[in-house]
Amino acid sequence: AEAVFRTVPVAPLVTTGLLVLPTLADATAALPALVDAGLATIELLDATSLRVAQTLSDAPAAITDLTVDRHAALLVEVHATTDAELADGAARLEALAAGLPRAAPFALTRELAARAALWHVRKGLYPAVAEARPSGTTALLEDIAVPVANLLPTCEALEALFARHGYESAV
């Protein structure tokens, strides 16, 4: 037997940030420019996700200090192999972020504990929601992929579907 692995190299240098925006529409509108900037990671968190994240013990101030209404956030990362590449990618991201309608201060960090806390927010959402569900109910977990242009209407349709069927705290 034979196998061929097409692996992706892991860049040794990473900076991570959480870009909090007033609405899901603002977050999805920012995506094309962020993708074009060459970000390694862009993870979307909707308002429900942010509310759940506020219950996590190590949630950053950008989330805990927020009075969540229709907000959304983007967990973003720049990866690089040299300090110069990382500085260039971070500068591009910060310039883009400066032009967006941010709902909280934006900062990038290379510090491992701060980066881990940001990722704990993202990765801790499903367990937090599942744990809080009433006895006898099930938490659903399904990743979907849609073209960026369809992301906002897809998210809005899912929110409406969950509301219509009384499925609360869907992330």
Where are these regions (language model features)?
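Noncatalytic alpha-helical scaffold of FAD-dependent oxidoreductases
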Residues: 1-171
